[in-house]
Every structure is written in structure tokens, then in C-alpha cells.
Regions:
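Short catalytic micro-motifs in class I SAM-dependent methyltransferases
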Residues: 51-55
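A conserved beta-strand element that flanks and buttresses the S-adenosyl-L-methionine
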Residues: 48
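Class I (Rossmann-like) S-adenosyl-L-methionine-dependent methyltransferase catalytic domain
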Residues: 1-42, 56-71, 76-157
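Conserved acidic residues
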Residues: 45
Length: 157
């Protein structure tokens, strides 16, 4: 799910190139497409967010967590890629209140490991680390200004 038709086309191209079958791509708002009773409401064994969370204003974290609660299967995994705060990171490190005073997200929000653990405290952390730096010749994507994280939902929820 992505708002961008270019992102959907790129993802479809990558999936086809990898020989992935049965992958469905949807263009639209992830919040609307996964609402209760909607076609994509889930549950899913894996939800992967690459670049959505760090572009949400602070007040949307509540609806984001509600989306995960609604769509992630018991024992399912949530993988996240987002801007890292601190040296070598990227994104705004302003406090939430200051973001509202300035009227913008400054290109995206940077998170510390502690902030991510606090936001996703209802999930079990499996791994949280900076991405490896992958060079331009690597077939893999990796930028050290990003966090990569894996969490698991409780099995009995």
C-alpha cells in the first residue's frame, strides 16, 4: 500500500524481478484501506513500513498504533524503517510541541531507540539497529541514517 503510483510501479517491478507471485499492490491511504471492514483490514502475519511512520505528525501515532492493533495478527511481525536521530541520522529532532509551533515536520521525524521503544511498547522488540551502509553496487538497500526494526505482536491478543 502506498499513496505514490511511482512507488507501486517500482515495488511491482522489484517483485516481478525477484519472481514473487501472489503479491498484491494497492495505491491509496493505508489508514482508509485497512479500516475495520475494509478490503485490506487483515489480519497480517507481517506488516512492513518503509518510510510512512517518520512522515506522520505526532498526533497520528495514535491512529497508527490502532492500525497495527487492528491489522497485525496475534504473534505477527512488524518491521519498520525510519529516520534515526543522533549523529549521522536524518530528520527533525524537534520536540513534538515545537513541531506544532513551527507548523511542519521538517521533512520527516527522527527517532531515538528509546522513543521507538516507547511508541511500540505494546510489541516485543526483536531487533532495533541502524541499517548497514550498502554501496551503490550492492543489490541491497542500506543507509546508516535509518533505523531498521523488527517487533512481534503478543500471541494471545
Amino acid at each position: 500500500v502506498d499513496l505514490s503510483p511511482e512507488a507501486i510501479a517500482w515495488a511491482r517491478e522489484r517483485a516481478d524481478g525477484a519472481g514473487a507471485r501472489g503479491v498484491r499492490f494497492h495505491r491509496g491511504d493505508a489508514f482508509a484501506l485497512t479500516a475495520a471492514g475494509a478490503a485490506l483490514a487483515g489480519p497480517y502475519d507481517l506488516i512492513y513500513d518503509s518510510g510512512c511512520f517518520h512522515h506522520l505528525p505526532p498526533h497520528r501515532r495514535i491512529s497508527y498504533l490502532a492500525l497495527l492493533e487492528r491489522c497485525l495478527a496475534p504473534g505477527g511481525h512488524f518491521a519498520l524503517t525510519c529516520f534515526a536521530a543522533g549523529e549521522g541520522g536524518m530528520g527533525s529532532e524537534l520536540p513534538d510541541a515545537e513541531l506544532y509551533r513551527t507548523g511542519g515536520l521538517q521533512g520527516g521525524l527522527a527517532y531515538s531507540p528509546e522513543a521507538l521503544r516507547r511508541v511500540f511498547s505494546g510489541l516485543t522488540e526483536i531487533e532495533l539497529r541502524r541499517m548497514n551502509d550498502e554501496g551503490p553496487r550492492s543489490p541491497l538497500f542500506g543507509e546508516p541514517f535509518l533505523w531498521t526494526a523488527l517487533f512481534r505482536a503478543p500471541a494471545g491478543r
